[in-house]
Swiss-Prot record:
Alphabetized InterPro entries for the sequence: MFS_dom, MFS_sugar_transport-like, MFS_trans_sf
Species of provenance: Drosophila melanogaster (Fruit fly)
Similarity annotation: Belongs to the major facilitator (TC 2.A.1) superfamily. Organic cation transporter (TC 2.A.1.19) family.
PANTHER family: SOLUTE CARRIER FAMILY 22 MEMBER
Keywords: Amino-acid transport, Cell membrane, Glycoprotein, Membrane, Transmembrane, Transmembrane helix, Transport
Coiled coil: none
Glycosylation sites: N68, N88
Protein's name in the database: Beta-alanine transporter
Main location: membrane
Membrane topology listed for this record: Multi-pass membrane protein
GO molecular function, one term: beta-alanine transmembrane transporter activity
Residue intervals annotated with topology Extracellular: 45-151, 204-212, 265-268, 384-390, 440-442, 495-501
Length: 604
């Protein structure tokens, strides 16, 4: 049974859907943004230098003096963060005790540095570190000294968070079909709030790491649940709208998170600030309906009909008296057909790779999905490392997404999916790579790259859902999205490698985007096309192969003969047409076969 027909009878986008989406589903996008990226500031690394116990009395008031006495400089002239001078600081302390403050400020330790100019050795920090608290009053890095040879533990926390997301995305696919959309969402939300709030009371790094893993388990589910519910409550003509609005809500969550971080600078307080207010979402538990589409799919017809009646009443639609009878009759027929089909056909992941066209489309979609997820998460993680005000950079990273979605909305309706996906990824990739040539405008190029990846991140799931056949659509979407979650595991390591070369992660992410952009040209356009229902229909839709000859030939009349020209051998890589005459008569039609996509066209 086509549920979209049922929605048209009760109102596919009326007051009921608008109230649910605006009051519940859009605010529900905030937890994902909060918990996915608050860790960047909970585990922020402030400026630091080696602690020298003998110079401790002067550290607070004469920081520059203490650094000159104890800290060497790097090649770029900055003070080292992981090394110090090995000196007899007892003699220096005796000298400092008898110097008045004005003399100390004036001399800047020039005389003291001459005491041991040749014999001074540089050694790693021996007694811990002093941290700059002008930006953050406290972070996990400060509390557990996750710097220097322990700095990789910060990256490890992001990797573990990504592993949790990978597993959570896999488990959520089962729970959402087993429990339903609403119970799954609130179960994950409760687990997320408890784990994030508990991490504020962690007593060591590994306890905090384990709790962040649990938070990572819930983030994909929290992100997917509002989107799935919104899509299933509206008609097909409003799904692009729901996709855009859902992403706008997510970007607003990033902007709001930047404001929360600006106010709360202690990591324990920040963990509570991004978790406890989300308990207010439970006040909507009895307002948010279960998906009637899912209820019908699992045979809970009475609950589905009850929700549909409420939907019709709120939307101001009067349904016919025989509405319930017709609906139940359709359900019986549909269930019998599905039972018969399930007895003969079972689909698995291998079905995505049986036919050559489906295999290629699955691999291309998965590659592009991996590139999108990796670069989007990577650029969001990279924002605080751009230099300058870290919180302002993160605010910009979220704010630049908002105008992108407003421009994308009409573009998807008038220009299609394929070219918008290609242009978005190409522009974003070129902007990221260009930071190597124009380092002075890295922030501007970063914003352009973020706008590009934000656009493609919206288009790809929509295009993928229109390319996978109905019988394996959910399976194909899950497969591609799960594989793409490897990106958030790998990308923190690339960002960690970029500590010595700031633009290195941007170059890697830009190259990945460009590769995915050109791969998107191999996919066929899906705008205004009927969705494939079976594997055979999906296999019959050929790849596009950039500017395939078959696409151009559709615009030309078949009965016009080209004027005879001198025969020229085609260049390598260009499509070649093979004429295959049938030996029936001299006037029979012939087949023109494209050598690239193997699509046959009949002409005179």
């Amino acid at each position: 049974m086509d549920f979209d027909e049922v929605l048209r009878e009760v109102g596919s986008f009326g007051l009921y859907q608008k109230v649910i989406i605006c009051s519940v589903l859009l605010p529900a996008a905030l937890p994902c943004a909060f918990h996915a990226y608050s860790q960047l500031f909970i585990a922020a690394t402030p400026q630091h230098f080696c602690r020298v116990p003998e110079l401790e009395p002067w550290t607070q008031d004469y920081v520059q003096l203490v650094k000159n006495l104890s800290i060497p400089r790097n090649r770029n002239g900055a003070y080292a963060e992981c090394s110090m001078y090995s000196r007899n600081y007892t003699d220096i302390v005796r000298y400092l005790e008898y110097r008045p403050p004005p003399d100390l400020l004036r001399q800047q330790a020039e005389d003291l540095l001459k005491l041991q100019p040749d014999t001074t050795q540089v050694v790693p920090c021996q007694h811990g570190w002093h941290y700059d608290k002008s930006i953050y009053s406290s972070t996990v890095v400060q509390e557990w000294n996750l710097v220097c040879d322990r700095s990789f533990l910060v990256t490890l926390a992001l990797v573990v968070f990504g592993v949790g997301g990978l597993l959570g995305n896999y488990v959520f696919g089962y729970l959402v079909d087993l429990w339903g959309r609403r119970p799954s969402f609130y179960a994950y939300l409760l687990l997320e709030i408890i784990a994030c709030a508990a991490s504020a009371f962690a007593w060591n790094y590994y306890t905090w790491l384990g709790l962040r893993f649990v938070v990572g388990l819930t983030v994909p589910a929290i992100l997917a649940s509002p989107y799935v519910l919104a899509i299933e409550l509206v008609g097909p003509e409003r799904r692009v709208f729901c996709t855009i609005v859902s992403n706008i809500a997510y970007s607003l969550g990033l902007v709001v998170l930047a404001g929360v971080i600006y106010i709360v600078r202690d990591w324990r307080e920040l963990s509570l600030a991004v978790s406890m207010p989300l308990l207010m979402l439970f006040s909507c538990f009895f307002v948010l309906p279960e998906s009637p589409r899912w209820l019908m799919a699992v045979g809970k017809t009475r609950r589905a009909i009850k929700i549909l009646k409420v939907m019709a009443r709120v939307n101001g639609v009067r349904v016919n008296r025989d509405f319930v009878e017709r609906l139940q009759r359709k359900l019986v027929i549909t269930r019998a057909a599905e039972t018969k089909s399930s007895m003969t056909t079972h689909y698995g992941i291998l079905d995505l790779f049986r036919g050559p066209n489906m295999r290629r489309k699955t691999l291309i979609i998965t590659l592009i999905w991996f590139a999108n997820t990796s670069v989007y998460v990577g650029l969001s993680y990279y924002a605080p490392a751009l230099g300058g005000d870290e919180i302002w950079n993160f605010f910009l990273a979220g704010a630049v997404e908002l105008p992108t979605y407003l421009l994308l909305w009409p573009g998807l309706s008038y220009f299609g999916r394929r070219w918008i996906l290609f242009i978005s990824m190409l522009v974003g990739g070129v902007a990221c790579v260009a930071t190597f040539l124009y380092p002075d405008i890295t922030l501007l190029l970063y914003c352009v790259g973020k706008m590009g990846i934000s656009s493609s991140f919206v288009v790809l799931p929509l295009m993928a859902s229109e390319l996978y056949p109905t019988v394996v659509r959910g399976l194909g979407m899950s497969f591609s999205s799960v594989i793409s979650m490897v990106g958030p595991i790998v990308i923190p390591m690339i960002n960690h490698m970029g500590q010595q070369m700031l633009v290195l992660p941007l170059i890697v992410m830009g190259a990945l985007l460009i590769l995915g952009g050109f791969a998107s040209l191999l996919l066929p356009e899906t705008r205004n096309r009927n969705l494939p229902q079976t594997l055979e229909e999906g296999e019959a839709v050929p790849l596009s192969f950039l500017l395939c000859c078959c696409v151009e030939s559709e615009r030309k009349p078949n009965n016009i003969r080209a004027s005879p020209k001198k025969r020229i051998l085609p260049e390598a890589g260009t499509p070649v047409f093979h004429r295959v005459d049938t030996p029936v008569s001299d006037r029979v039609p012939c087949k023109i076969v494209c050598s690239i996509c193997k699509n046959e066209m009949r002409t005179l």
